[in-house]
């Protein structure tokens, strides 16, 4: 994760660094291309020769002669980066992601060139204000600068370059919004990178107890409330779903709670994230190929806790509570079996038809308990819940389902702003019928069809009339659509920035408890 220090400079005077970046739009008509005359002349020559067009991701690397004017701001190198034509983007979210991808591309070039001190001339666009451009660019740089090398030897090639140390945004004019945008982008990106760190940890390290320890550390650093419910608490409260999934494990379960509850809060949002630290499928065992990636089954839990990192720093007017039911799902002599019946926190009974449909079982208890305990204005849950959502939406969209149109729209808007697109799927009585059980109130799978929707239908039994949206990130938590700021192999940190965007833009009274 990047440890770079960020700063905004009015101009390039006195700056020195390994790389200076100018972003160039792919426009049909051109005035001045970049702000420095000699660099502008060189770029124009490249345009005229057809060597550079400004299309997205295209690069032109210049090496200034330090005895001439081309020695811009003491830069060892100058990178001219094409960002495409922002006028081609149909939605504001598309322009935001264009500059986020530009930031990711810059980070990639910095890795190739082993850059430690980076200077970026803040690009101008009529579609975003300078603060928004700074936010997206910095977000992309931070996210693109991510690497996880904790378990590599010090002499390994992966440790030859450990990322950026200093980043200067050169704004060209005094604008407090630029510094604010830079801070917003940095905070959201660092929170997402922390979620990537959690997911990258092996399951023998990142256990339910590790979730609890992270929450306690974050709470202490930022004066948040923290509660850890132990196995004995769950037994007393009747959280049969979490306890059943944990039966085959040697690690005790935890219900991890982080609270940001300012005295002047108008409303409280509840975030719930699936925290299955390793999912073997239990008795309904998963196939061996690719099972090592099931350490990523806790990405929903990572997202809600790491979103709280940004919340703690920004201190919004709305209260936020994050809950992670944490356990692994293993087979063993005591493991829950297909055909078993359990009783959830709210008293509903469930027949376990498939032990690999465990995520909904632990989320059910967390949702019901969280609503009962905090009386939130609305609930959002995140989970790597079903393979069915991958079959339906691939790795491009996360699926959402819920009982409240206004909340769903707010979440869709937040996802668009964050570059994490969402696609709403239906819910209704026809899908609820698929999970009816002959021996219990409900069963934990609903057959081969509409698997993502029937999983949400299971969860709907535990939210009552509270406005609620479920976000299935099974297709996007890793192997997400390739972007310059998303690792090609490994966890994406999806969901964190969507939640942060939702909270930043929250308007009290928007969501009412009606459908």
From Swiss-Prot:
Give the E.C. number(s): 3.4.11.1, 3.4.11.10
- Which residues of this UniProt protein bind Mn(2+) 1? 279, 356, 358
An example Gene Ontology CC term for this record: cytoplasm
Q: Which SUPFAM superfamilies match?
A: Macro domain-like (SSF52949), Zn-dependent exopeptidases (SSF53187)
Locate the transmembrane regions by residue number: none
Sorted keywords for this record are: Aminopeptidase, Cytoplasm, Hydrolase, Manganese, Metal-binding, Protease
What Gene Ontology molecular-function terms does this entry list? manganese ion binding; metalloaminopeptidase activity
GO biological process terms, alphabetically, are:
proteolysis
Which InterPro entries does the record match to this protein? Leucine_aapep/pepB (IPR011356), Macro_dom-like (IPR043472), Peptidase_M17_C (IPR000819), Peptidase_M17_leu_NH2_pept (IPR023042), Peptidase_M17_N (IPR008283)
Q: Which reaction does it catalyse?
A: Release of an N-terminal amino acid, Xaa-|-Yaa-, in which Xaa is preferably Leu, but may be other amino acids including Pro although not Arg or Lys, and Yaa may be Pro. Amino acid amides and methyl esters are also readily hydrolyzed, but rates on arylamides are exceedingly low; Release of an N-terminal amino acid, preferentially leucine, but not glutamic or aspartic acids
- The active site consists of 286, 360
The positions annotated for binding Mn(2+) 2 are 274, 279, 297, 358
PROSITE patterns, alphabetically? CYTOSOL_AP
Record localization: Cytoplasm
Family that this chain belongs to: Belongs to the peptidase M17 family.
Summary of the function given for this chain in its UniProt record: Presumably involved in the processing and regular turnover of intracellular proteins. Catalyzes the removal of unsubstituted N-terminal amino acids from various peptides.
Please report the name of this protein according to its UniProt entry. Answer: Probable cytosol aminopeptidase
